[in-house]
């Protein structure tokens, strides 16, 4: 009740009462639908990935500019609670200078037998979850990406990637790992962040985790080599407990409706978009280089 169904795209685009169109169709259709909508004077929200590659999205950006409308992508996972916690830890320097971030999602059921298993439709886990995790990292780390290396696996079928490992190096020296798996029967941590004065970990979606913080950096090396569980070792011997503090993860503000609250503010008051097209383009450029890296079996240098 209250919803209108249209028989064709043309009929929808001809409706003068519609000012914004949400495109939530298979990935390979986004560009054509978006450009048609923008040429009809409609603002466009695209489900992720916004396009099949950066070139397609650049065409969409040009259409938005030519027709005086806005274009954005539904990168709503910027408001996920786990991400907001890790972003707060990073922003507030709770671990000192961060040198490593690992972000992953893992399951054990493979990819469902839908269009997401078809290459022609833009299936695969890099397009499905990878674009979310890449967007989160780029929104967190204020530094250009200078290298990309990707490994894909095809475990449950051979058409699209169902397991992904993507390594990014940032200009500030920080490294990041994005990992998506669909054949994992023991899960690794959702988030792992290592800094010079502490480490933070979120185990799973239930937000269980902790921070281990350094409170005394004065390492007192023993006169004799300690005998550890891995054998005699000075380097791998555990720190004394009085030099470390285990603390709970901080709270973080989460507004699940913020994406659409922002869009209303853009429409009513001309506010800036929360998910800017330039940010989406940057993520798509990383996706493109991931495919190149896997094909060439090589690290790809860049400045994105």
Give the positions of each predicted feature.
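Predominantly a Rossmann-like dinucleotide-binding segment in NAD(P)-dependent oxidoreductases
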Residues: 77-157, 297
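Hydrophobic residues in well-ordered beta-strands that form the structural core
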Residues: 7, 46, 71-73, 102, ...
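Rossmann-fold dehydrogenase core element
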Residues: 58-76, 96-103
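Glycine-rich phosphate/pyrophosphate-binding beta-alpha loops
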Residues: 179-187
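C-terminal glycine/acidic-rich active-site capping loop/insertion
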Residues: 197-275
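C-terminal helix-rich "cap/oligomerization" subdomain common to oxidoreductases
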Residues: 20-22, 58, 171, 247-248, ...
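Beta-loop-alpha module in the N-terminal Rossmann-like domain of NAD(P)-dependent dehydrogenases
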Residues: 3-63
